[in-house]
Amino acid sequence: VQVCIADTANEVLAATASTATTVTKKKNGLYKEKGKNYYYTNGKKIKNQWKTVKGKKYYFGPKYYAVTYHNKINGKIYVFDTFGKLLNGKKSRIVNVGKNSYYVNKYGIPSTGWLYLSDKNLYYADSWGRFYKNRTYESIKFNGKGQAAKNDMRTLKIKCMDIVKRNTNSKMSKSQKLRACWNYVVRNTYYSSRYYPNLRQNNWWRTTALRTLGTGSGNCYGYACAFAALAREIGYDPYVVCGRVPGTRDGAWDGYTRHSWVLINGYHYDPEGQAKGWHTGVYGTSRYGMSYQVQKKVNFRTGNGN
């Protein structure tokens, strides 16, 4: 009788080899999960950090995924595409992300406010840098690309931007810029009574400002509207006053004649009176300095009061 005895040691070794433990490799680098990009370091997702992957910069926010569109990071706004790549580059340019358009510099930071770009188009970007599209703002219409309609309102805006740029600088305070705009209107406008605006027409204050700034001439309404347009351009909210002051030009029985000046924050500014020398020193004064009547006050920005 033959008896078979198992080699116990060899069997144990064979069993161990067949059930060897598989070691899972920890994630490192960029991974796309459920439509969002994440970055792993030693198997853990990172957050609130910049990372560069294959030459493209990403920012992984507080929820771990790469942020997209516009985001404020350490006090600055940056624009990213829909994959989370920072839209930086060699020069400033218009970029499109989804339905939004931005004008970003080489660091991916968008411009805000009014923009007159090298394509000869006027745009307006909100506080996040998004272009206004298919809407009207301050009587200027924007199309689906964010471009302003080419009309008198656009022409006035570009004219004001140019005058302010040529007569002020970034080191000036807001009040210093206002004085520079005042000096420009007073010194560069000659009096002409050939044109009186129709105060019943819509946007007469803007068309009058454009006429005066464009021709360098105007009556009291022209001076007032031109100064109000420039004041608005540097951030004030002026009113054009349509009133009457003592005078004989209109031949009215009560001894008053038509006149126009500007109110800013309740203070009076009379550029035509200054330029012509008949009522000087009315610059930011709490009182007008002579008796007057007010027919209406028109907010230059909104048109309220017209």
Task: List the predicted regions and their residue ranges.
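Extracellular adhesion/carbohydrate-binding repeat motifs centered on closely spaced tryptophans
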Residues: 1-155, 249-265, 273, 292
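Secondary-structure boundary elements
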Residues: 155-212
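Hydrophobic/aromatic-rich core segments of domains that either
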Residues: 222-291
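Low-complexity, Gly/Ser/Thr/Pro-rich intrinsically disordered linker/tail segments
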Residues: 282-306
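Non-catalytic ligand/cofactor/substrate-binding and regulatory segments of enzyme domains
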Residues: 150-160, 181, 288-295
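Active-site nucleophilic cysteine motif
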Residues: 177-181, 185, 216-231
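Short coil/turn segments at secondary-structure boundaries
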Residues: 151, 169, 215-218
